[in-house]
């Protein structure tokens, strides 16, 4: 029942929220938000297990699939979308599914989250395989849409994870790895878009970023597979080449163009004094890791 969930409890610090000034509201919100990273720190070992599993799936050609309803679903869609320009992956490698489909991203779809079959069908629609990793996201930890999806994922042999914001969450029993970030009562009772949503976003950031590092999408702390989809990212790409190689702007730009705007390839060309074709071959042998490529 909802009344037994910590995320549905009333926050004693904000019982009289409607009497507070804007300054006081912001102060108490900030104070409550500071508790989120502390809660996440307690479950880092579980997050690490998910990351290791995602890396393994990626190495087998599998995908990462986020799945949730409402705010939880939107956060998954957001993180999946950001992986494309940040890490240069295809939009099929990291997928975000939300109960009710794309329309639900901007408007609530009545009853969508209450259907287990809908969660199962959404995974069937993308032809889920045993090489994929499915992460169900639900602040309450009890969303039927997510539970249905996790059960189906396990039935086809896919790895599964669950992210919730309550202890002993129902969805935890339906996943291989459970991450329960206990964020407690919200300043606005039951509004899990607040601390719970913040916690979910931070955990998703960790999972996608650490997993991408694990498959060679990063050199040092640079986004070497960035997809230059606009002028800002084109300039960032050249700066990344400069940082990685200590080349000047003119040289970085020259190799950027010679590498057909592939930052990673340009870096290897400069650091190993090789042609684009040889750089691509070296990177392939090193499974895309720049550090391993240039150390050979």
Swiss-Prot record:
Its EC number is 4.2.1.126. It catalyses: N-acetyl-D-muramate 6-phosphate + H2O = N-acetyl-D-glucosamine 6-phosphate + (R)-lactate. It comes from the Bacteria. PROSITE patterns: GCKR, SIS. It is an enzyme of class 4 (lyase). Keywords: Carbohydrate metabolism, Lyase. The keyword Zinc does not apply. The active site is at residues 82, 113. Pfam families: GKRP_SIS_N (PF22645). Residues 54-217 form the SIS domain. A lyase-type mechanism (elimination/hydration) is suggested for the cleavage of the lactyl ether bond of MurNAc 6-phosphate, with the formation of an alpha,beta-unsaturated aldehyde intermediate with (E)-stereochemistry, followed by the syn addition of water to give product. Specifically catalyzes the cleavage of the D-lactyl ether substituent of MurNAc 6-phosphate, producing GlcNAc 6-phosphate and D-lactate. This is N-acetylmuramic acid 6-phosphate etherase. The gene is murQ.
